[in-house]
A protein has these predicted regions:
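Membrane-interface extramembranous regions
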Residues: 1-123
Length: 123
């Protein structure tokens, strides 16, 4: 049996679970999609599919590099959603958090997720 780096498997599981959650709990994600984007439901479903596919593509070594780059591109594409979350007072539907959490997600968590993908591209 081939051994996979635990970090890569954790990342794959993270993105597959996050992607599936777009279908299980769309009410969580829909308020995070900026209102100025049309087709919020399509965006939510597409994001879920992309996250699941990229998460699965992290597992085989032959596709890991491209999956990592895809995740980085996806995370960059999600930046407007993070900015929008701050613009709407860090509220997504009925869930409201202190504004600093919205900024922390944008300035710290988001770059760390990009770095995580970058660090796993050749793992």
């Amino acid at each position: 049996m081939k051994k996979y780096p635990l970090n890569v498997l954790a990342m794959a599981l993270f993105y597959v679970a996050a992607g599936l959650n777009h279908f299980i709990n769309p009410a969580f994600y829909l308020p995070l999609i900026p209102r100025y984007f049309p087709y919020q439901t399509l965006i939510n479903w597409s994001s879920g599919v992309i996250e699941v596919v990229l998460g699965l593509l992290l597992i085989p070594t032959f596709s890991r590099k491209w999956a990592a780059f895809g995740i980085m591109a996806m995370l960059i594409a999600f930046i407007p959603s993070h900015v929008y979350f701050i613009e709407v007072n860090s509220c997504a539907g009925d869930l409201c958090v202190p504004e600093w959490i919205g900024w922390f997600r944008l300035v710290m968590i988001h770059p760390l997720l990009v770095y995580w993908a970058w660090s796993n591209r050749n793992a």
